[in-house]
């Protein structure tokens, strides 16, 4: 799951589609947000679909009862491994995106009610409040996930999955901010 999550799809699509190295433009982040800003949404859409379906959902499904039957704990670990791979890619000197789309895919495979909460907080926030920055709303959703998982009485593995994702998100935010140089390149 980590290796699949590590595939730097936004970087590759930026290079192939328009010859742009997104590590050297915009935020310097090699995620779909920077790809959208630098190359355009028509190129970012397939990347988001890949990140959701292949990096997030596929490892969870493979670990699930539908394929290998390894149990909810291994499914959750596979989802987190995909996100960690996306955030700290072995193919990109351990730089990566923020993992939000990969997390959507992992959560889709793990638990639909948790996915609805994770996805609806940013949607409601952006659509119905004056604060239009989806990153803020995704961060709020990440913080709320463990609380909702516990309130919904989900299996303890999903509560820990939510806690792990919150910690991975916090770690990515802190390391991204500390690694930026003055040129805006990570």
Where are these regions (language model features)?
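Short, non-helical or kinked segments that cap or interrupt transmembrane helices
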Residues: 20-31, 91-104, 131-141
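Multi-pass membrane catalytic core of lipid/isoprenoid biosynthesis enzymes
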Residues: 37-64
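Helix-coil boundary and interhelical linker segments in multi-pass alpha-helical membrane proteins
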Residues: 56-77, 108-114, 149-160
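Cytosolic, membrane-interface loops and tails of multi-pass inner-membrane proteins
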Residues: 12-44, 96, 178-186
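Interfacial segments of multi-pass membrane proteins
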Residues: 36-40, 63, 100-130, 143-152
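Loop-to-transmembrane alpha-helix initiation sites
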Residues: 115-120, 133-141, 153-166
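C-terminal ends of transmembrane helices
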Residues: 10-13, 83-95, 122-131, 170-180
């Amino acid at each position: 799951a980590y290796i699949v999550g590590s595939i730097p799809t936004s970087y590759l699509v930026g290079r192939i589609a328009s010859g742009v190295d997104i590590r050297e433009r915009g935020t310097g982040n090699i995620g779909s947000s920077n790809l959208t800003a630098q190359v355009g949404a028509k190129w970012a859409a397939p990347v988001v679909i890949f990140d959701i379906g292949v990096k997030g959902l596929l490892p969870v499904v493979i670990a699930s009862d539908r394929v290998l039957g390894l149990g909810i704990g291994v499914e959750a670990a596979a989802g987190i491994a995909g996100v960690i791979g996306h955030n700290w890619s072995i193919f990109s000197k351990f730089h990566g995106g923020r993992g939000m789309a990969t997390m959507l895919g992992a959560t889709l495979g793990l638990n639909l009610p948790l996915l609805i909460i994770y996805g609806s907080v940013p949607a409601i926030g952006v659509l119905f409040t004056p604060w239009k920055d989806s990153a803020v709303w995704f961060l709020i959703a990440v913080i709320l996930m463990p609380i909702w998982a516990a309130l919904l009485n989900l299996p303890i593995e999903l509560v820990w999955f939510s806690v792990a994702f919150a910690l991975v998100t916090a770690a990515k935010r802190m390391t991204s901010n500390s690694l930026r140089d003055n040129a805006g390149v990570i």
